[in-house]
Amino acid sequence: MGCSPIGVIVCTGVPHCFAPNIVRDAAINPAPAKAVRRKARRSIFNLQDFSRGHNISGGQFKNTLRDAKSFPAGHSQPPQANSLGLRYHQYMAVQTPISSLKTRDQSALPTHAFGTHAFRAYDPLLEPIAAKVMAQQRLSANDGLALYASHDVLAVGWLANHVRERMHGDVTYFNVNRHINPTNVCVAACKLCAFGRKKGDPAGYTMALSEAWETAASGYTEAVTEFHIVGGLHPDLPFEFFLDVIRGLKERFPKVHIKAFTMVEIAFLARRAKLSVEETLLKLREAGVDSMPGGGAEIFAARVRSIICDHKIDGEEWLETARTAHNLGFKSNATMLYGHIENDGDRVDHLLKLRALQDETGGFQTFIPLAFHPENTPLDHLPVTTGLTDIRQIAVSRLLLDNFPHIKAYWQMMTPKIAQIALRFGADDLDGTVIEEKIYHDAGATTPQGMTRKELCRLITEAGRVPVERDTLYHAVTRSEDSFTVAV
């Protein structure tokens, strides 16, 4: 009687079990299968019987009991579990120590060479996707759905990491930035938002011009290279107020890049000022705006937007506003809010619409997946996203958005620990020091309000990557005491 192999994932180069670089097999003797089946039917499982029947010492067997998965991740139920008559949780408890693993012929496993490593997928749906990734061919909508559906998340991450390293090697970017939110008064009343307040709400605020400038100065202790400015859709503030905020910042901090106003805000300001979007953008440029952030995109699917943000511009107007900005020479980012009421198809649709616009304009620099934080929102009955969902989203984004230079793991939303792991799942950017982030903390985020350059570098280096400080346009930044120079 032959041996039945059990695949065991062995991880190297990444904390814990988040990057399958080597796959080997342990052989298990099926001789005691009948006895195990009988006991399994009665929910009895004797570890001594099992270890003795498989020529594993009792002490060695006990050392193998872990809570990690030891079956091919592409299968909902391990095939070997059925042949041995084991229940799912019993099979999950069996792992062979790495030191005792035997290498066998891997020819039966699908393999693709990536440099000195090999990709092996236990999910057959990933095979054609892997072939496309190797050939640097574009993935389809169906490929995207398969990536979301696959149980072999480690293989999905492996592919995304391959693309990431092909584009950036080990380089991982961060910047020293300061968030400024001039007002939280907003007419949109989005169900996904814990930041906005109605006019007259005691918790609402609007900064005076001097307060906005002082806020910027208070975050200048590390010589920031970027001001990130977003806020609510205030029903009364004139367009001129926002132009004055920008002019004052540019006058006081001429070297700092100003990344200001989402596509939603720009469309709103244009309506308030009775200007076209193009005219609005030109006035913002004249005042000192250098680029735009990517917020407000949420999910483009009309069905979802009608529930979570029905008073915002729709997905098509968001894309059209971005198109106009890019055609005027502005660079911008793009986001997607996930983990609420959307489905995998909505996510794929969102990503492919961004990809199509990037084909046309080339104006996007970075894609930032944003995990929904339900606390303090009308959707607080929804669960928070899991770490597995977060790292899968990073990986799928990297694989589908082949024309986006960068994928950001926004540590404020994902937590620093998950963001660090994401650096092995396709992300090449951690965002920055941030300093006093409000929007996601109002939604219950418990991450720090900011991080130092030293802390960000530690996260990156511990992940086996090389930290590179950048400015907003991804030029390398060199520092000397409290000053900096940008390599353009």
Features from the language model and the residues they span:
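Short alpha-helix boundary/capping segments
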Residues: 23-40
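Conserved Radical SAM active-site core
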Residues: 197-335, 340-357
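Canonical Radical SAM [4Fe-4S] cluster-binding loop centered on the CxxxCxxC motif
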Residues: 166-168, 172-211
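Hydrophobic faces of well-ordered beta-strands that scaffold small-molecule active sites
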Residues: 172-178, 227, 258-260, 292-294, ...
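Short, positively charged and aromatic/hydrophobic N-terminal segments
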Residues: 42-44, 75, 88
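Auxiliary Fe-S-binding modules of radical SAM enzymes
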Residues: 91-154, 220, 352, 358-488
